[in-house]
Design a protein with these regions (language model features):
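Walker A (P-loop) phosphate-binding motif
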Residues: 2-36
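Phosphate-binding/switch loop-helix module in NTP-utilizing enzymes
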Residues: 77-122
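G-domain G4 guanine-recognition motif of GTPases
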Residues: 112-113, 142-144, 162-181, 187-200, ...
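Inter-motif core of Ras-like GTPase G domains
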Residues: 124-146, 153-163
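Acidic, Ser/Thr-rich peripheral helices and adjacent loops at domain boundaries
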Residues: 59-64, 152-169
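Canonical P-loop GTPase G-domain recognition
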Residues: 203-229
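General beta-strand structural signal in soluble alpha/beta enzymes
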Residues: 16, 40-44, 76-79, 108-112, ...
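N-terminal phosphate/diphosphate-binding loop that engages ATP/GTP or pyrophosphate donors
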Residues: 30-84
């Protein structure tokens, strides 16, 4: 199943939060939507790396955004980040808010969270940074974190342990991850990425059984998801 159908992505602003493949989801979903004839603006409220083959618009001129969308179908609207993130080549929030971009592009996909490249995370009080106008939040979970010690696989392990009632040395189970997702109540739907074996898929199915939001699982790198419920 393609990503749009598996995640029920609608026109307007969609926020991508969590860990384990947010930027990959933005890139693959944008390409999929572009291939269907839609225009897509990529944005962030935190930081992300530039997208290969996608024009980056750093100004606040809406005509420049329109031109980039007309030329390539997809435009990244962001500015070079400051400090260590900028030194690493990352981009930060652009001059045009996602709600403004929604008047220019059919779809606006926003990376609204950070995870320090770890497969799992819990959220601090100020996270995620979901922008005004966002109609849904897709939470990405990295299946590679299942079975790994919480202290090694989770961004903000102390918060994770508080919500899941576990210790940093415990392994991250689907039950613990589900407890955190339920307690936070941030997700409109969940995507379990890195499901490239029966063990990972079994963990995703267990997660789905414990949640009351739709769950899809598969490989974002391959552009493949299966809707579990």
């Amino acid at each position: 199943m393609n990503l749009q159908d598996a995640l029920c992505i609608r026109p307007g602003v969609t926020s991508v939060i969590g860990s384990g493949g947010k930027s990959t989801l933005l890139a693959r979903l944008a390409e999929e939507l572009r291939a269907k004839g839609a225009t897509v603006a990529l944005a962030t409220t935190t930081h992300f790396m530039p997208f290969e083959g996608v024009a980056t618009v750093t100004g606040h001129d809406v005509d420049e955004v329109r031109a980039a969308l007309a030329a390539g179908g997809v435009a990244c609207v962001a500015v070079p980040a400051e400090g260590p993130a900028g030194a690493a080549g990352k981009l930060g929030p652009g001059a045009l808010a996602p709600a403004e971009l929604a008047r220019l592009a059919d779809y606006v996909l926003v990376e609204a969270d950070g995870s320090r490249r770890l497969p799992l995370k819990a959220h601090a009080a100020w996270e995620p940074v979901v922008p005004a106008g966002s109609t849904q939040s897709v939470l990405v979970v990295g299946a590679s974190g299942f079975g790994q010690p919480v202290r090694e696989a989770v961004h903000r392990p102390e918060r994770f342990c508080e919500l899941a009632r576990c210790s940093p040395d415990d392994v991250a189970t689907p039950d613990a991850v589900a407890a955190v997702i339920r307690a936070e109540g941030l997700a409109s739907r969940v995507t379990v990425n890195q499901c490239e074996g029966e063990g990972a898929l079994a963990c995703a199915r267990r997660l789905q059984a414990l949640l009351d939001v739709p769950v899809a699982a598969g490989s974002l790198r391959e552009g493949r998801l299966e809707r579990l419920g």
